[in-house]
Design a protein with these regions (language model features):
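A detector of single, family-specific signature residues
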Residues: 1-398
């Protein structure tokens, strides 16, 4: 048995090959993440007598090139959580941290856990694309939030509270009514310098041009509030330029978010479990694809507890002797992106309260018992995942 430990970094990796009882087959050496170097590594591993298993840490996205190529070469590859490697066999007072030492440590881990190593599954291109899109979606959502807060901060100095006038959601092209309104009426003087009738006519024409619903009472309310507001920045070309730039940045981020949302739904609809997932309560065309992106292929989980552990919503255990802790925090060792999506699903269930849904009934029961927010939300996420696993696996097997 040959254990190949690979310490992965960006663009290159350190490789060590060992056998039981500390026998060194190959001293640590460096390879680049290029076709020629990877092919040379495959030839070296195949030339070593006996069964070989490759272990590496799944660090960011760096490991995927090696894991994919080595798996394609019909080699046994196992990608391990870095924390498991870090906590393994720390029996020395010396603190040695180098790529060579890490590669040897990973090889020793492979030998020790030989029977328990799980083989890396090459994710099909569709799921890989969906997961990449979801990560980009999360990135641009954060960017959009930052741009939104930036615009509100500037508008508070020219037209305080304008962002609260409308609560309509973003359109498919990313546009929002309050942003379009602030782009046109960027200063409070843009409204109150007109007469009431002139503003109503102007606002009505604006709604017609932008294809928004017009309400005369809303126009009168906006005009009345504008009369009482006190701006800080003057109504001049410089202030207008600052606001226009902030609006353009927000619209750009919002357009990207909505286009990704649409593309993710189109991509997810090609997966076999799409109809089952979309039929679940709390899941729509936005959260459904996000769930499928983060969970991936359900068949790789051997049982329900495996998928809850993957998400990090499984209950912890703290027992020693006669002591047994009754309430233990969840592990939170799994995918933080999946936990975030699950919490959003729970939030939708709480807001829509579908009485016939078992997950909502469970959430409502825990809330009635006086459980803290994070306790009942995490418990609901756990139950939702178990139901998700059961329904999807049953559908795929049929």
């Amino acid at each position: 048995m040959n254990a190949v430990g690979i310490d992965v970094s960006k663009g290159k990796s350190m490789v060590a090959i060992m056998r039981p009882f500390g026998e060194i087959v190959s001293l640590p050496f460096e390879i680049k993440h290029t076709t020629s170097d990877i092919n040379s590594l495959v030839e070296l591993i195949n030339s070593v007598e006996g069964e070989s298993r490759i272990v590496m840490e799944h660090t960011g996205r760096y490991y995927e090139v090696l894991a994919h190529q080595l798996s394609e070469a019909n080699l046994f590859v196992s990608a391990i959580n870095p924390k498991l490697i870090k906590d393994f066999d720390n029996d020395s007072l010396r603190k040695v941290k180098s790529d060579k030492a890490d590669a040897v440590k990973i090889a020793r881990y492979a030998l020790d856990k030989w029977q328990n190593l799980k083989q890396y599954n090459v994710m099909d291109e569709l799921r890989n694309q969906l997961k990449t899109m979801n990560r980009q979606f999360g990135f641009y959502m954060k960017h959009k939030t930052a741009m939104k807060n930036n615009l509100i901060g500037i508008l508070d100095q020219t037209y305080p509270g304008v962002n609260d006038y409308f609560d309509s959601p973003a359109r498919s092209d990313g546009s929002q009514k309050w942003v379009d309104f602030a782009s046109t009426y960027w200063h409070v003087d843009c409204v109150r310098k007109m007469s009431l009738n002139a503003f109503i006519d102007h606002y009505q024409n604006w709604c017609k041009r932008k294809k928004y619903n017009f309400s005369q009472s809303k126009a009168e309310e906006i005009y009345g509030k504008a009369k009482e507001l006190v701006p800080v920045l003057p109504k001049d070309a410089i202030t207008k330029l600052i606001i226009k730039q902030a609006v353009d940045q927000l619209n750009s981020a919002s357009t990207t978010v909505e286009s990704l949302r649409t593309l993710m739904n189109e991509t997810a609809s090609k997966l076999p479990e799409y109809s089952v997932v979309m039929a679940m309560k709390g899941v729509g065309t936005s959260l459904g694809p996000q769930l499928m992106a983060e969970i991936g292929d359900v068949s790789r989980f051997t049982h329900k507890s495996a998928i809850t552990a993957f998400a990090g919503v499984d209950p912890g255990v703290n027992e020693s002797g006669s002591y047994e802790q009754k309430s233990v925090p969840t592990s939170k060792r799994g995918s933080s992106d999946l936990r975030k999506t699950l919490f959003q699903v729970m939030d939708v269930l709480i807001k829509t309260h579908p009485q016939d849904d078992p997950v909502y009934q469970f959430l409502d029961k825990k809330r009635a018992q006086g459980k803290p927010y994070y306790v009942y939300m995490t418990a609901g996420a756990n139950k939702f995942l178990r139901i998700y696993y059961g329904r999807v696996k049953e559908y795929l097997s049929s």
